[in-house]
A protein has these predicted regions:
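Phosphate/nucleotide-binding catalytic core
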Residues: 1-180
Length: 180
């Protein structure tokens, strides 16, 4: 057999592949929710054969603050998380990872953890993803965080439930380009 990479958001594995302690441990360190400012619950790796892959986005900036990082993550939810509901058809990953507002603080800024490995499946899609980071930052610079905060419940519920119809409404409101 020839080997080839698989770019997928999630996959089910046979029990015999998941017997080691390492295979049962999820998450190397805690991640946070930008919307609640709380720590996300770590998924339990011993109760499921589902495993997932992320395409985390790292954003660095000068004058790092926790609030600014949370604002960036919220904007990324609008410009990446919401479109991912429409573009990425894998709905299983969010049962483990990839919920709205998922991030880690870094030495240089923040790490957005919502996008899945699906975004690595096509170079044009990966390029679109990175372009959306700039769109989110440009939006924050021009309009601030207020409108996004006002839409917070709508954004979070849409991402976490995978509601495509609501995602399309948010895409229209924020004039998000889905072409890649």
């Amino acid at each position: 057999k020839s080997l080839h990479p698989l770019y997928a958001a999630s996959g089910e594995y046979d029990d015999d592949q998941l017997q080691s302690d390492e295979a049962k441990e999820f998450g190397c360190s805690p991640d946070f929710n930008a919307w609640t400012n709380g720590v996300n619950k770590k998924p339990e790796g011993t109760t499921t054969t589902l495993r997932s892959a992320g395409c985390h986005c790292h954003v660095g900036y000068d004058g790092k603050t926790a609030k600014r990082s949370r604002d960036i993550i919220k904007a990324l939810d609008v410009f990446i998380g919401i479109p991912s509901v429409i573009i990425d058809t894998d709905t299983k990953r969010r049962s483990l990872y990839g919920k709205a507002g998922c991030f880690r603080h870094t030495m240089f800024g923040c790490e957005y953890r919502t996008p899945s490995g699906f975004f690595l499946s096509d170079p044009k899609l990966t390029e679109w993803l990175f372009g959306q980071i700039f769109e989110a930052i440009n939006y924050l610079n021009e309009f601030g965080i207020e409108e996004i905060n006002n839409d917070g419940t709508w954004i979070v519920e849409t991402i976490n439930s995978g509601n495509i119809n609501e995602a399309k409404k948010i895409v229209e409101k924020y004039k998000i380009n889905l072409k890649y």
